[in-house]
Amino acid sequence: MTSETITVIANIALAVSAIIALVFGIVQVKTATRDRRERLTLEALRNFNTREFSELMNYVTAHDIPPTHEKWQKLPAHEGIIITQFAQEMESLGILVAERLINIDLVDKTIGSLVSIAWGKYKVMIQDSRKKRPDPFLCEYFEWLAERIDERMRNAPRKPFYLKW
């Protein structure tokens, strides 16, 4: 065997090993992404099933949200905290959906209409707070998520799962 032949074989082997490493790396990244999405989905489901989240949902659906930042600040501390906590939960959920870390289908199937109803209650206060703080980014992902859920419910409402069987 000549040195040229050996060099060609070595170069081919090197190229093949680089291709194999690249394919392996791509597969690993896809697997890690899928695992992360699955983990976040399960975590979101667990969060929706906590007593704390149930209390937040119950409060928000049963009470009016103050229309202004000032009226929100005058609420008893525990009520203001509940209103803030629920908005933070919805904001976090919106971020997870916007960044495609969890699928909007999960939100639609679990608390979809709640997001829209809650945003309807929060909207006036949040818009007031955005102007007065000023913080134009306040609850932007909560608003975005509620708008996406509304669009889905209007344009392509899903059928209840039990009707599919």
Name these PLM-found stretches.
Residues 45-74, 136-151, 159-163:
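Long amphipathic alpha-helical segments that form oligomerization/scaffold cores
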Residues 11, 24, 72-75, 86, ...:
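Generic signal for short, ordered secondary-structure residues
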Residues 3-6, 42, 76-83, 108, ...:
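Amphipathic, non-membrane alpha-helical segments in soluble helical-bundle scaffolds
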Residues 63-93:
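A contiguous binding-surface segment within folded domains or other stable secondary-structure elements
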Residues 42, 68-69, 126-130:
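Charged, low-complexity surface segments at secondary-structure and domain boundaries
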Residues 82, 87, 92-165:
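An amphipathic alpha-helical interaction surface
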Residues 2-5, 9, 13, 80, ...:
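N-proximal short alpha-helices
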Residues 2-67:
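Membrane-proximal alpha-helical anchors
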